[in-house]
Amino acid sequence: MSNGSIPVDEVIEHLRNWNFTWNIILTILLVVLQYGHYKYSVFLYGVKMAILWILWPLVLALSLFDAWASFQVNWVFFAFSILMACITLMLWIMYFVNSIRLWRRTHSWWSFNPETDALLTTSVMGRQVCIPVLGAPTGVTLTLLSGTLFVEGYKVATGVQVSQLPNFVTVAKATTTIVYGRVGRSVNASSGTGWAFYVRSKHGDYSAVSNPSAVLTDSEKVLHLV
């Protein structure tokens, strides 16, 4: 056209393509967020974690770019961009500090899961089991079904005997470790079926790495970030 304007049909076509692209992106994002749980799909969970980890540096880079673009042009935008960059950087640093502190207690890479700040740990058949939880619960239940052990609904081991159920479990947070002692159980040794219930007994600066005994040894009591 002579006046240099963009034809309406071309604008509609670009909007249609743009809308279709965003429809695909948002649908994929919706599926990842809804079903990106470790119990449902390890692959979707990995994609979800990658998205969460990428968001911090991406938002920080966008905030710094906005600050550079707004410098001496729009001081209000510049101030807000600097503020958002500082908030993002602070959240990023806090995430790494708390994750490292949690890792020192559990020695598990679940410590770097950005979805939670608490890990339930116990020892089963000499193997350390670590499960992310949303918070420190009032009580913890271990369920044994025909020799298959479930911890808070997670399948963690098979071929487990009733006598191998631990005497305590721990829930580690960045600032403390909560020890749960066994207060009751109902088991059928012949079928390898039953349950054990644990409640809070104490908390402190303990290592969350546990053993099947009822007493925390001196080697399990370690100081962390102070």
From Swiss-Prot:
InterPro entries: ALPHA_CORONA_M (IPR042551), M_CoV (IPR002574). The gene is M. GO terms for cellular component: host cell Golgi membrane; membrane; viral envelope; virion membrane. Residues 1-11, 63-75 are virion surface. Belongs to the alphacoronaviruses M protein family. It is a multi-pass membrane protein. Coiled coil: none annotated. Pfam families: CoV_M. The keyword Glycoprotein applies. This is Membrane protein. It is found in: Virion membrane; Host Golgi apparatus membrane. The chain crosses the membrane at residues 12-32, 42-62, 76-96. The lineage of its organism: Viruses, Riboviria, Orthornavirae, Pisuviricota, Pisoniviricetes. Residues 200-216 are annotated as: Interaction with N protein. CDD domains: alphaCoV_M (cd21564). Homomultimer. Interacts with envelope E protein in the budding compartment of the host cell, which is located between endoplasmic reticulum and the Golgi complex. Forms a complex with HE and S proteins. Interacts with nucleocapsid N protein. This interaction probably participates in RNA packaging into the virus. Residues 33-41, 97-226 are intravirion. Component of the viral envelope that plays a central role in virus morphogenesis and assembly via its interactions with other viral proteins. GO terms for molecular function: structural constituent of virion. Keywords: Glycoprotein, Host Golgi apparatus, Host membrane, Membrane, Transmembrane, Transmembrane helix, Viral envelope protein, Viral matrix protein, Virion.
